[in-house]
Amino acid sequence: RPRRFSATEIDDWIADPYSLYAKRILQLRPQEDLDRPIDAALRGNLVHDALAAFLKDHPAGSLPEDALARLRATARRLFEPYWQNPTMRHFWWPAFETISAWFIETEVNRRATILESHAEIKGRIEVEAPAGPVIFTARADRIDRLAGGGLAVLDYKTGRAPTKAAVAKRRRTQLLVESVIAARGGFEGLDSAVVEAMEYWR
């Protein structure tokens, strides 16, 4: 019986228990696609990686005047292996230019309310259960230490974000699990603190 679950697996468990059974009990895995298509999942990974790299370079304090140019340069290097694909050049890159402009504008204003940002940060907690301890893990897109000492847990979505109803009914629990781990001090380099905000950025 599995005793370790990631935050994303909890959502899978709720939505489709058999998929988790197939993965964790039957050990079934989809075959690797040797010629991966340019799809929405790849686009999401590239955007996440670009934003994470930028935040790791600028975790605290005011942003440099050329912040937008730096973010786009970082993203351009990540997009480069797929640049010959017309969809990448003519659709995804223009979309990222729009995303990056919004991100930097938002970030400039946000820096007045935060002490530091942690991007792509790993965390885990152990919870006692009747059959023995269960470990919950997560890799948060971003956690900010707020000026007042609390935390804000953020998740980037390049596709559709969960609805408020789905989160309220605990049908989408990724941010909730990450917030519990954060509140208990389970993320690397972050002391326990009150989680004051959970946000989806799309």
State where each predicted segment sits.
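C-terminal, charged and often intrinsically disordered regions of DNA end-processing helicases
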Residues: 1-53
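Active-site-proximal structural scaffolding
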Residues: 3-6, 14-15, 40-44, 64, ...
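Active-site-adjacent bridging/hinge elements
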Residues: 17-28, 71-76, 144-157, 202
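Short, polar/flexible loop-turn hinges at active-site or ligand-entry regions and domain interfaces
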Residues: 28-36, 57-63, 187-190
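A non-catalytic, helix-rich entry segment at domain boundaries
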Residues: 46-128
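Substrate-binding beta-hairpin/strand module that engages nucleic acids
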Residues: 66, 116-117, 179-202
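Non-catalytic protein-protein interaction segments used by genome-maintenance enzymes to assemble
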Residues: 118-186
